[in-house]
């Protein structure tokens, strides 16, 4: 009897142990990401050819305690390597695990390599050569908890590589994962009609057809690890392969199970057909191009087993939530009598099916932890009478309080926005505490920003509420799900800075009181336009005529544009970011503003103030609540530093000049007493700078008009 270890993804251990038991292996012991077993050589060959779940099978040659580099070397040296492979063969060592005296896997591999080479030399042979890639004989070593296991890679390249896949589609499913889905769903034990409406490159259906047709999954592989092993019995192996080929030929002819696959992507369906043909099961599977929401049950009962798209694969989160919700509705209405098994990495997506799972399991798709849920759809008992809206959501079913509130807000604000001459505005701002999001409308797009929930609320609850928001939105305000953009932010507590999200750009042009501004809805946490400062910008424009205007911490220069359009004599725009200065220039160009009177300065604003000798008639400053940028010499805290900041700015203000000061610190307290002693007059103007769409959140910012006393 020989000792083996069958490696597999985490979560496969139980299924793999059952499979090995059915093969006739003995001394089966589950471990982490694999199963130990013993078997004679003939059975080991059969297992290697027929296993549908294992990723790799290794023949254990040595296993024992190891507490030093010397012990590791001796353990490897004591193995009779010339009895396992010829010095004419190349070899490689795959070492896993660190700890104790092994700081890195390369060190462990090197020690074993030295021992192997020395053993050949000491036995009077020339040393074999090491090949880092495509070696003839592969040594597999594992070090864990002071125990070293040295083995031979018996199976060769990963066993999930069956040999039938031509190329992969987007986010391919590994073959042994598909096989495990079929096993754990119960389908393999009682094969019946099988449907996969998101078939992709056909992996689930092909693996199922291989099972039903009694085709060995390794039959098309052209390489195995034992081929250069000196104890390999070629005749026995060839007999096992010949038997498998005979069974496959007979199995395809006898198979009466029906398989149906569809995908919305015609290229993937074509690929699935090629893969099925390569696997020898194309005649058993009916493929077609179709939207999963339009499929019909091909039989009165059967299994629907699928791996639909999720965040790591495809699509916008709102679109995916809609898709899952509509799928759940379709299953309830049309698939009574069927069983459904679904793999998904996002618990909120799979929860959006609104189906009660019979069983919930975990599986790993590579490193990605996924939920694998099983459902039984009882005929007629779970059908929903209310039709699904075109957007996929019945408002009465999902977050009704949120849906009704935002629907009401949107209706009221749309008329107001048209009258105001704006097309970007806020339609919801955590009006209902349970739905702790802000929803901003930018032309025909919507951005949903999630505020950080209190620590007392479980994460699962906040995720579910956010999913409900994204599900309810399309029907509530009449927007296409693919035009909903999701962002996450905290309520500003002083440390929030502008944050870049990704390289993709979704740029729009918005209009505000006659001014045009460029928006980037996806590149940054903020879009390029602070909507709550809309009236403040207009105020700057109204006060700008004939004046020298300074805009500090200018961001994308929107207040500068209003000043220029308002007839300012000159406009100086200062920001530390090259990106925002370039953006400000773009905004000026959009509005046809050009000339030497418009100056753009990239600089540390605080240092620029200290160095400036000019006078201005109107200054607008909207500093960050807190900043510790690497480009700044010192940190800045608006509460701590506002007196020094304003006193320095007043020195730049002409005798009749005005300073508009705004910030977003929620509990900001203006030190009026100290400023008054400095002959500075301060007046709060929140009442005229808070837009209607922010009336529900009056603490979004605070704004002050400051002059010489």
Swiss-Prot record:
Q: Where in the cell is it found?
A: Cytoplasm
State the EC number(s). 2.1.1.173, 2.1.1.264
Could you tell me which residue ranges the THUMP domain spans? 43-154
Task: List the Gene Ontology MF annotations in alphabetical order.
Answer: 23S rRNA (guanine(2445)-N(2))-methyltransferase activity; RNA binding; rRNA (guanine-N7-)-methyltransferase activity
Judging by the UniProt lineage, the source's domain of life is Bacteria
Which UniProt keywords are present, listed alphabetically?
Cytoplasm, Methyltransferase, RNA-binding, rRNA processing, S-adenosyl-L-methionine, Transferase
Where does the UniProt annotation place the signal sequence?
none
CDD domains given in the database record: AdoMet_MTases (cd02440), THUMP_AdoMetMT (cd11715)
Pfam families, sorted: Methyltrans_SAM, RlmL_1st, THUMP, UPF0020
The top EC class is: transferase
Under the cellular component aspect of Gene Ontology, which terms does the record hold? cytoplasm
The reaction(s) catalysed by this protein are: guanosine(2445) in 23S rRNA + S-adenosyl-L-methionine = N(2)-methylguanosine(2445) in 23S rRNA + S-adenosyl-L-homocysteine + H(+); guanosine(2069) in 23S rRNA + S-adenosyl-L-methionine = N(2)-methylguanosine(2069) in 23S rRNA + S-adenosyl-L-homocysteine + H(+)
Function, as annotated, reads: Specifically methylates the guanine in position 2445 (m2G2445) and the guanine in position 2069 (m7G2069) of 23S rRNA.
The family line of this record is: Belongs to the methyltransferase superfamily. RlmKL family.
Q: What is this protein called?
A: Ribosomal RNA large subunit methyltransferase K/L
Q: What is the lineage of its organism?
A: Bacteria, Pseudomonadati, Pseudomonadota, Gammaproteobacteria, Alteromonadales
Q: Which gene encodes it?
A: rlmL
